[in-house]
A protein has these predicted regions:
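ASCE RecA-like P-loop NTPase motor cores
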Residues: 1-303
Length: 303
């Protein structure tokens, strides 16, 4: 549940200043959670989506917690960075892939629906190229109650998406089939889903706890993403328009808030050096150009 706060007196001045070119406002003084309040209230006053950029993961997680409190968790998304790149031999953790893929899914849907999401990320996440929105949507499997789909074709599609057939669903990426019941643990979900079929028709969709098999809620529609973001990126990296900056998922009226710009710039240069020449990572100049079309607020505790 969102917590209602009295609007800061500076918000009117900030929103008026953002109406004038070059659509950038420097705000000096707020610290800690006050920065999140400024961002949330400015986005609300302007009725715009928000992209909040931080120097690092710890800062981003703190801002995410703040915004989830102020605006409601259902409106806020965290986009963590890969701890390893797609070109590395190691695979990223499922938790990071799940959060990244779910945020991309939500952004892809929000752009069509006009939903105003508040997205928080470290600068490292912005520098890492993502699957182009078009390709993510093309590879997304949508299933809803009342839909008719052949069970064999469904299983074939899930296998192509990288899911593994198991006797029982326990981990993300698992799928099991028992008669007219199909259990799927989507990579972007916290809990698996149970699809009950009558013939080829989906009669019900329920979330359930894998340990107890207890149902915890009904769903009308589920979107299932490819099991591996790494495989998706690798497959599309040589395709023209296969990868893009995350900013391409954002509406033109997005408000970008940069927390402590010097620290963000310093971290961006560190990432550049670490990934020099890697096609999965943009330079700061490229990233800056990608967000230049958005109105911006730069926050600093001291001048």
């Amino acid at each position: 549940m969102a917590v209602q706060l009295t609007q800061l007196s500076a918000i009117d001045a900030i929103t008026k200043a953002l109406a004038k070119k070059p659509y950038r406002v420097d705000v000096v003084g707020p610290w800690g959670s006050a920065k999140s309040v400024v961002a949330a209230q400015a986005a609300a006053a302007l009725d715009r989506p928000l992209l909040f950029l931080c120097a690092g993961r710890i800062e981003a997680e703190a801002v995410y917690d703040d915004l989830a409190t102020f605006a409601g968790e259902e409106r806020v998304a965290l986009f963590p960075a890969w701890e390893v790149l797609p070109s590395d031999t190691m695979n990223p953790s499922d938790d990071i892939v799940a959060e990244r893929m779910d945020t991309l899914r939500r952004l892809a849907n929000a752009l069509d629906a006009g939903e105003r999401l508040l997205v928080v990320m470290p600068i490292r996440s912005l520098l890492q190229r993502v699957v182009a929105r078009k390709h993510l949507i093309d590879d997304m499997l949508s299933l809803e109650v009342g839909q008719e789909i052949d069970l064999d074709l469904l299983l074939e599609r899930l296998i192509k998406l990288g899911y593994t057939r198991e006797v029982m669903v326990e981990n993300r990426g698992d799928v099991s089939v028992r008669g007219g019941i199909v259990d799927i643990f989507p990579i972007s979900a916290e809990l698996p889903c149970r699809f009950e079929f009558f013939g080829d028709e989906i009669e019900s969709i329920r979330r359930f706890e894998p340990e107890t098999q207890r149902s915890v809620g009904d769903e009308k529609r589920i979107q299932i993403l490819p099991r591996s973001e790494k495989s998706l990126l690798t497959r599309l990296e040589s395709k023209e328009g296969g990868l893009e900056a995350l900013s391409a998922y954002l509406p033109d009226n997005t408000l970008v808030v940069i927390d402590e710009p010097p620290a963000v710039l310093e971290e961006a240069h560190i990432v550049e050096k670490q990934a020099s020449g890697n096609k999965h990572v943009m330079t700061w100049v490229e990233a800056e150009a990608a967000i230049d079309r958005f109105a911006q607020i730069h926050l600093a505790q001291v001048a």
